[in-house]
Amino acid sequence: MRINMGIQKKLCAVVLLLSMLQSTMIYAEERVYGITEYGPVSVNGNGVGRGQDPTYQYIEDLLYNRQGNSNPSGTNPTPGTTSAPANPGVQNNGGGNTATTQERKWNLAKLSKSGQTKTIASEVNANYVVVFDLDQGTILGEKNSSATMNPASMTKVMTLLVAVENLPDLEKKLTITQDIVDFVKARGASNCGFVAGEQVRVKDLLYGVILPSGADAVLALAKEVAGSEAGFVALMNKKAQDLGLSSECRFQNASGLYHSTHHMTVKDMGEIMAAAMRNSLAREVLSTENYQIPATNKHGNGIKLTNLFIQRIKTQDTGGASVTMAKTGFVRQSMFCSVSSGKGGNGKNLLVVTGYSSSTWQCIMDHAALYKRFG
C-alpha cells in the first residue's frame, strides 16, 4: 500500500516529537504533548532561545503545513533591533521610560456589561473571555469576565511595566547569577537560555521577559529594581492599586508561576495591558515579533527571540484584523491564556483576553475568532 508523501512526513514528525519528549531537554509545566505556549525550553547554551529549537520548528512546520521559515519576512533582525510593526508617534525614550502614547480615558477593570455586550458561548473554547472596544471604552463581548483566574505568564505584562518604569538605563548590563539559573531549572520555567555569569543589557532582558516569556530575564530585572523578587512583587501589587484594579488582583511572584492567591479577572488583565500600551517602551516590546539579542560574553552569536503568538495568528482567519501585541501564559490551573491587542477588519481598536483554552493553537484560534466577530 502506497502512503501519501504528506502523510509520511507527518508520521515522521510525530516520531521525532515522541523522541524529543524522551530526551534530556527540560520542559516547563505547560509542555503538554510537547506543543506549548511557545515550545521547548532550550538549555543547550547554543544561542537558540525558547521556541527556537530547530528540530521542534521543523516538526511544527510539517504538522501545520508551513514552509519552515520561522521569520515570515525572510530576514534576520540586526542584533539589538526588532521587527516590530511601525507604531506612529511611539518612540523609545531611552530613559525614565514613563512617556505615554495616550492619556488614560477609562479603567477597563471597572467597566460593566451594557445592553450591547454580547454573551460569548460555545464559539470559543476559552472559559474566561473579555473583548474591549478601546475607542469607545466598552465591553463588546464577555464570558465569566468578573470571575477569578490565575493569569500565568500574562503576569509578565505587569512585570514589564514595573521594570520599564524603574530602570532608566537601558544599556546597563546585569549579570545572570547561578541562583537564577538554578531556580529556572528546578521549576522547569520558561527561559531565554541565559547561563550563569552572562552579562545582558537591561533592554535585552525586557524583550526576554515578553517574547520567550523568560523567567531568567524576570528575576534579573526584579533583583536590579528591588533587590529581590519579593520586593519587586510588592511594587507590582502597588501598581495594581494605583491602576484601580479589582480586589481580586493579587500577585505572589513576578513570573506567573502558580500560587493559590496569585489571581485576577480577565478585566484586570485588560487594564494591565492597556497601561503597558500607554508606555512607549512597553508598547514597543509587546508589539515586537522578532528580536535579536546581540553577542554576550556567553553567547557569541547572541540569542534570537520570537513572539510566536504574533507570528502564528497571521496564519488564522481574523476577518482582516491585524493583531500587533500579545502575551501568552500557561499554568495547569488556568490552562492556555493570552492577552492581545490589534485593529479589527472594520477599524476598531480591540483588546482581547482569554483564559482556559485547551491548547496553544486553540488559544490562538479563539483570539482569531473574536477579532473576526467583533472587529
Name every feature range the model reports, one short phrase each.
Residues E30-G39, G47, Y58-D61, R66, ...:
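Active-site-adjacent loops and short helices of periplasmic peptidoglycan-processing enzymes
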Residues I3-C12:
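Bacterial N-terminal signal peptides that target proteins for export
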Residues R278-G319:
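Conserved active-site loop region of the serine DD-peptidase/beta-lactamase
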Residues L243-G244, S280, E289, T328:
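Residues at alpha-helix termini
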Residues V14-Q22:
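Bacterial N-terminal signal peptides
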Residues M25-G141, S145-M149, L167-P168, K173, ...:
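Structured C-terminal helix/loop/strand segments within mature extracytoplasmic catalytic/sensor domains
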